């Protein structure tokens, strides 16, 4: 646990020096704040931009940052030096994963406040966001572990995060895309958030898709780790 906290603090410092990674965490919360206050359109659903940018945030930030951090440190052989220094792979993953999850959840709190959620609604919103963030983090870890260079990892991560981040938005305008999007965890989280805003009942199929996605992402991560390792 001590080593994990060291990795956590190291990642905080490294991210503070990397503007590109910092932007990933603040971009969509800032856009939501601006759009929620600057744009008012008749018949627009309440807090429309909160839901839209929240999904983009959980679909892009954790996946992209997790991929970038792991692939960069693999390419620079930083991980090998850490492991020689008695840091285990589990401690490393817990450290960087804890930081990325915490940073993304700060954004989720911003979305929750903007959305006007209170009490149990606010907690439910954060739990829903946390589930999506965890899936995205695991997918990012898989890509980072499997790729041998940061360029290769970015090449693969970009289309993956674009799909999960923008599929729910595209599904609003096309029924065909909506049918495909129903299998994506980001779409079901969008529906859960919409239902929370509208005060409707939770659909079991939405929870099922998110749960299956979390299990599948965990399985992919375990397979990638056993096959490729971190160093």
Located regions from the model:
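N-terminal Sec/SRP start-transfer signal
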Residues: 1-21, 229
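Hydrophobic alpha-helical transmembrane segments of multi-pass membrane transport/permease proteins
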Residues: 14-40, 49-65, 156-171, 208-218
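A structural motif at transmembrane helix-loop-helix junctions in multipass membrane proteins
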Residues: 22, 130-168
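Hydrophobic alpha-helical transmembrane segments of multi-pass membrane transport proteins
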Residues: 46-111
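Short alpha-helical transmembrane interface motifs in multi-pass membrane proteins
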Residues: 51, 59-64, 94-95, 120-128, ...
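Alpha-helical transmembrane segments and their short interhelical loops
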Residues: 89-90, 97-147
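Junction motif at the cytosolic side of a transmembrane helix
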Residues: 142, 210-231
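Terminal transmembrane helical anchor/hairpin motif
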Residues: 168-215, 219
């Amino acid at each position: 646990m001590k080593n994990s906290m060291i990795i956590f603090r190291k990642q905080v410092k490294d991210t503070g020096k990397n503007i590109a990674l910092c932007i990933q965490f603040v971009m969509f919360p800032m856009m939501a704040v601006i759009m929620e206050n600057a744009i008012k359109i008749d018949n627009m659903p309440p807090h429309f931009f909160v839901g839209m940018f929240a999904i983009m945030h959980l679909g892009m930030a954790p996946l992209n940052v997790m991929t970038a951090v792991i692939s960069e440190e693999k390419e620079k052989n930083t991980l090998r030096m850490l492991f020689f220094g008695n840091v285990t792979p589990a401690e490393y993953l817990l450290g960087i994963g804890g930081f990325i999850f915490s940073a993304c959840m700060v954004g989720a709190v911003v979305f929750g406040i903007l959305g006007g959620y209170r009490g149990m609604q606010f907690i439910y919103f954060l739990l829903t966001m946390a589930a999506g963030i965890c899936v995205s983090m695991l997918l990012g870890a898989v890509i980072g572990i499997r790729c041998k260079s940061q360029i290769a990892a970015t090449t693969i991560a970009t289309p993956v995060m674009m799909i999960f981040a923008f599929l729910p938005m595209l599904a609003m305008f096309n029924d065909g895309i909506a049918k495909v999007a129903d299998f994506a965890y980001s779409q079901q989280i969008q529906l859960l958030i919409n239902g929370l805003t509208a005060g409707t009942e939770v659909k079991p199929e939405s929870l099922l898709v998110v749960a299956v996605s979390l299990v599948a992402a965990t399985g992919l991560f375990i397979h990638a780790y056993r096959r490729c390792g971190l160093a």
